[in-house]
């Protein structure tokens, strides 16, 4: 049984002498006052700075370029060896933070993946997943897409939903573009029902507390966890301006560090991720939503609402700053030590100023003492050393070929045309027939140089991490894990050499999704005025954030399905054991 935890920071040698068996912890525990009259933790602000490595945080603090983050570190625990989910894609990365689980339990491998049971959508998606038939009561098999392509109009900030121009949410999702469940009347599978486990949002909402989140796509209302309905009802206020929509001017709007967004569309003809400044304007929309929540408003600031018990957002600016090459100007890093280029440093400075706006709002509302701030990242980015970047096939098309090209004859049609596989610095391969796995592995070995092969996971090397690939013995309604094969586990995972990215683009120099250290070692900072600053060097995982949040709020971490299944502990150093 999980031990209880409590506030454990004691002042004075006298108390320590009287209680020698108690370990000195770094800060506040569950939501109750201790003898030192500390504020109870009533709110948790969770921030994912997508792409933010542990070394990025260390470097910006050392160079005095992120004063807000440095200040939070003065009242916080810093974890230097934090690893994300594997794969390190945004979808499983976010799920780790809110479920406490890995793809093995949660069932989320990538935003574009495959399910051997589900059926294709009723309409083509905006990114090219072709519609198909759904045969009731029969195993079908389809790629799964939970990104911008399932929106009504992904070119618009509001996703084409019934919102004002700069609003956005789940009503932008077109159910005709969602995969369907042949064992549930061929009904669409909404993203929050696609995942198999509950989330902190479900637990906190069930406890009668207000919840909110903001992210880059409407489908990331998946943080709700399963509801069995067409609504992610565990999230009381969800805000998702579409990051891959076309850049438009935002009149009278400025970022935290003063960038005017009134004429931002002059910078690019692309989406918000194609320009170093545009992405700041995009992220600022979400920053303003967080500030509105702190002020007791809804995300637009147009109505009163409770201050959420759990709330937060993801930043895209650092991730874009790491990858982007714009008109010959490179983001990323100047060396293998992670020293940022000026463009990359500007993205970190913007994020720092934005978090500063949140901290200022918490102070103004007298909420800082009662709020735990957790700052981490869904994923990192690889390679940090851009000299190691090697695109396959590259812009010329002559640098080699991705694994999907080598195995094209063994893959479902949807993987080689239309939407295609999501091959970044990883390749996950679902074969048409799993019995061809040995043949496929031999083909990859024979073409190892062409694919930049580092490691192949299949068979036992795969099933030590994930459930065995296959189909259930007795299939049933989505999305429970059933006896037999796992319909979502790839047959093969290719981990390329460090620096290899499967792309032909000339506008990127890194990616994420893989298992490399640069992909997975992200910053993790837990801050509150009552926490004594400390750096923890033991290995931890971002999945430990989920049970830690519940512990902060005085709720049972074992209420999370994935925590019970995987034994995910709370983060070390924060809570004091009762030593019963």
Regions found by a protein language model. Name each.
Residues 41-54, 71-73, 97, 204, ...:
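Beta-strand elements within well-structured catalytic alpha/beta cores of enzymes
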